[in-house]
From Swiss-Prot:
Pathway: Protein modification; protein ubiquitination. The modification Phosphotyrosine is found at Y417. GO terms for cellular component: cell periphery; cytosol; plasma membrane. Disruption phenotype: Lost basipetal PIN1 polarization, resulting in abnormal auxin accumulation all over the meristem surface as a result of the lack of an auxin sink. Plants missing NPY1/MAB4 and NPY3/MEL2 form pin-like inflorescences with several leaves and fertile flowers. Triple mutants missing NPY1/MAB4, NPY3/MEL2 and NPY5/MEL1 are sterile and have altered PIN1 localization in organs primordia (e.g. May act as a substrate-specific adapter of an E3 ubiquitin-protein ligase complex (CUL3-RBX1-BTB) which mediates the ubiquitination and subsequent proteasomal degradation of target proteins. Regulates basipetal PIN proteins (e.g. PIN1) polarization to establish inward auxin transport from the L1 surface of incipient organ primordia; this process is essential for the progression of flower organs development. Recruited to the plasma membrane by PINs (e.g. PIN1 and PIN2) and, in concert with AGC kinases-mediated (e.g. It comes from Arabidopsis thaliana (Mouse-ear cress). This is Phototropic-responsive NPH3 family protein NPY3. Its main location: membrane. Residues 513-524 have a biased composition (Basic and acidic residues). The BTB/POZ domain mediates the interaction with some component of ubiquitin ligase complexes. It holds the Pfam family NPH3.
Amino acid sequence: MKFMKLGSKPDSFQSDEDCVRYVATELATDVVVIVGDVKFHLHKFPLLSKSARLQKLIATTTTDEQSDDDEIRIPDIPGGPPAFEICAKFCYGMAVTLNAYNVVAVRCAAEYLEMYESIENGNLVYKMEVFLNSSVLRSWKDSIIVLQTTRSFYPWSEDVKLDVRCLESIALKAAMDPARVDWSYTYNRRKLLPPEMNNNSVPRDWWVEDLAELSIDLFKRVVSTIRRKGGVLPEVIGEALEVYAAKRIPGFMIQNDDNDDEEDVMEQRSLLETLVSMLPSEKQSVSCGFLIKLLKSSVSFECGEEERKELSRRIGEKLEEANVGDLLIRAPEGGETVYDIDIVETLIDEFVTQTEKRDELDCSDDINDSSKANVAKLIDGYLAEISRIETNLSTTKFITIAEKVSTFPRQSHDGVYRAIDMFLKQHPGITKSEKKSSSKLMDCRKLSPEACAHAVQNERLPLRVVVQILFFEQVRATTKPSLPPSGSHGSSRTTTEEECESVTATEETTTTTRDKTSSSEKTKAKGVVMSRIFSKLWTGKDKDGVGDVSSSDTSESPGSVTTVGDKSTPSTRRRRSSS
């Protein structure tokens, strides 16, 4: 820290009582200066020789009845008694030390006392300006300290432009080439630096942690000045906002709903809304994770609708960067669910809107498809997780969210299957119709062999879906290698679907009869049907690895599914009776 010493005489100020200060000298005092609740017994000559304001006040002063000294009251001097005492010592030529912590108070007090060059050469205002310009404002940390102290001395600090000069100094240094930074700064994130940067390198965001010490209004002014001057990348501005939020917002890293103090809530709400307004417009300036943390905090602190909409829009632009944990946003108290599912639905809608806009601008299809694939994977994982923890999640809401990404490209539907399976597992009380509707979200042709193996043994899935999976697995096994695994090109898709409908028609009769049987009979019936289905689908595979499935074009009756050469047998009739 820079400092400056003024004067050479020893300090002879002493205290008589708690609120009385005087100069220990043989010469009797002849003026009493009252500053707040402190009385200073001083001498007119050294004071009046340097202060134009005291000259004016002494002309209209009253006399102290006890000491016959003239009495001056200056209750509104910036900095109060401590600042006035430094100014008085300067008038006496006594040694005083100035630094970044007291320079604002003394500079404003000197301005108040009108200690200008017109009164005496080398007066206090001049010396303070020399110290500020040659030392304080050239120091990174001193400039920040001075800027912080200016708040307590408005409007005087503003009148002498101390705040503006500090802002300019800080912005100039922040925009400087990091290679030229040769002063100390606070940086506790070095472990996050890329491996190619050694410990001696200065990171481009070297300044952001020091600015996190500022109040939000000063921080906003500094960042605005930095952006106006240019030379700092939007990504670094975004990093500064994230570091500031992490330091200043309680529970920012982990969503916190414990907000009992209304005054604190209002303060944090204002801070959040200010940070949102400061977000750079560039898409890559802030991470999706940071935006989601802001959104979570805005829910906790009940920020305005405008801020939430802006955050949702920004998140929608880069939703593919999020992870499942990011989307677990706690709902306001009193809701049906623990987590806010509606807000996730809004984020998906925003993503869809943004991709449509990119399509209109003829953006690369590969980029859009890649983003959609990532979002589809994200939402599949989210649905699986939210199904696990939300017992009140409705089938309608589950399907609504899943359908929003149903047309997005996927390498497989394993994620969709896992989400459906978890939903059925955690919500056993849903109706058969709801099970059927939710299961339709999955394309059985796009399941991996591992997922198929799990699904065919999954008792939670409707039997019709299990039959479809078995059928398409058989088709996949018998299709020539040159054809797509899903068998979904041209007329082959129509034929496959018709054949599958014939196979799955078996389940219709089974389901009807199942409703009339006991629990044990249901299990037995399903086992018989499943055994029969396996037999029908894999007969061909046992014979030279090729199966032949024929079906009626119109009938969905159980008898419409036969293998070549298969005839009605007593066992067949027994299966139908059991089903």
